[in-house]
Amino acid sequence: MFKRMVLVALLGVFSSVSLSAKSLLRDDGILVSDLKGMKSELSDAPAWVFEDAKVPYEEMGVAYIPVNNKYLGIEQATLNAKLSLIVVFHEIMMKYKKRFMEQFHESEQTATNISYAIYNYLATKIQVAYTYTNLKSEVAVVKIKLVGCQIEQIKRYLKASVENLNDNEIAYIAKVAQKEFGSVCALR
């Protein structure tokens, strides 16, 4: 009973804080595709802000800067970029999920757990490469990329994270990971 009361109180505090903070944030969003149309406003921006990603598994994120705090803008832009990259990872995993389930007679839950384990591993390998802020336009731009990914680490991470995977299943997943992430993930 006491835990429930504490939980309700915390939920109320978080709700009121988020509702009061919402008025500080802009309702209109900004997209990476909007940056090319903002060249005059962002005239001091480095060239990478307006370029498309040249390297696989490199994403950009953009956000408005709330309450003149560039660090909050950078944080939000980084989260937006990470979400974009996770969507890319998810699309790759969905492409192989059904085939994996049929070939190894595994449940959908096991396939989902594998996906989550790989997302978690890859999320630890995402680094911010560049940041740019413009306080006048209230815009923060971040470029992130996948760095230090290793297929052997993915295999170890899977063994530790997903129960009952045998060596053949892990080898198959490693082969798929090498095929999809080979340009940015080393074998060792």
Features from the language model and the residues they span:
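Bacterial N-terminal signal peptides that target proteins for export
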Residues: 1-6
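Bacterial N-terminal signal peptides
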Residues: 8-16
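Domain-level marker for long, solvent-exposed, non-transmembrane regions
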Residues: 20-188
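Short amphipathic alpha-helical "recognition" segments used for binding
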Residues: 7-8, 79
